[in-house]
Amino acid sequence: MLDTNQQEFVYATYPDLKGKRVVITGGGSGIGGELTTAFAGQGARVFFLDIAEQASRELEATLSGAPIAPTFIKCDLTNLDELKAVFARIQEEAGGVDILLNNAANDDRHEIEDVTPAYWDSRMNVNLRHKFFCSQAVLPGMKERGHGVILNFGSISWHLPHTQLHLYMTAKAGIEGMTRALAREVGKYGIRANTVVPGAVVTPRQKALWHNPDEEARILAGQCIPERVEMTDVAALALFLASSNARHCSGREYFVDAGWYGA
C-alpha cells in the first residue's frame, strides 16, 4: 500500500478566498469540521452550522486563532423556521454569503420493512430538503452581487451496491439532480453550483459505528489508488471548487474516491 497519507497534508492557498463569507452546514465535526478548518485557514469568514453543540464549541475554540475566527451557530436544519432565522442573522452580521457548502447529512442504516412515512420524511429532511432551502436563502444576495458558489455534498453510496442505506442513497441521488438543475438556472447570474462526491472517507463517526479492518481492505482493493481517502482530500477539492480557479466548473459531480467508482 502507498504511504503518502503518512505525510503532513498542506492545503494549497487560494488568495481569492480570503475574506469570503462562507456558510458550512454540518460544520462541527467529521468532513464538515475539516471544511471549517480548511476555509478558516484561507482567511475566509466562516459561519458553521451544526446541531451538535459540544463538538462544535470545541472546534470553534480550537480555531479561535485563525485569521478570522469562525462562528458556530447551533441550528436544526430540519426546522425551516430555524434555518431561515439563522440565515437572516448571517445576513445582518456579514451582509450576505459568498460561498455555501451544504454538507450536513446523516447516514443511519435501516431495513426496507422498517421504514415508516414519518421516518422517510425525517431522512429526506436531514439529507436533502435543507440543501434546497439553504440555497434558496442565499441566492437573492448572490444574484444581486453577480457571483456566488454553492457546493452540495453527495455520496458515492448510491453509485455502488450498498445495502441498508435506501433512504440515504435516495436523498444523495436527488442532490446530484438538484444541483444540476440549480446550476442551469443560476449560471447567468455568475453563480456556480457543483456536487462534491466523497468516496470511502473514514470519519470519526464511521470509525465508531461501522469501520473494521476487513471492510477497509475490501474498499482499498476496489480503488484504483489503494490508500485511504482522508477528510483533508475532500476539503482540498472543496477549496478548489469554491475558488476562482474553478470559475468555469459548474453543474457537475466531482468525485474524490481514489478511483473506486467508474474505473
Language-model-detected regions and their locations in the chain:
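Short C-terminal tail/terminal secondary-structure segment
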Residues: L2-T13, L160, L239, S250-A263
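Canonical Rossmann dinucleotide-binding motif of NAD(H)/NADP(H)-dependent dehydrogenases/reductases
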Residues: D16-F47
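Active-site loop-to-helix junction immediately N-terminal to the catalytic Tyr of the SDR YXXXK motif
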Residues: D107, V115, P161-M169, A181
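C-terminal substrate-recognition "lid" of short-chain dehydrogenase/reductases
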Residues: F132, H147, R192, R228-V256, ...
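Alpha-helical segment proximal to the catalytic Tyr-Lys
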Residues: P140, R184-K188, R247
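Substrate-binding pocket helix/loop in short-chain dehydrogenase/reductase
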Residues: E111-I112, T116-M124, E216-I219
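Active-site helix of classical SDR
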Residues: S135, A171, T179
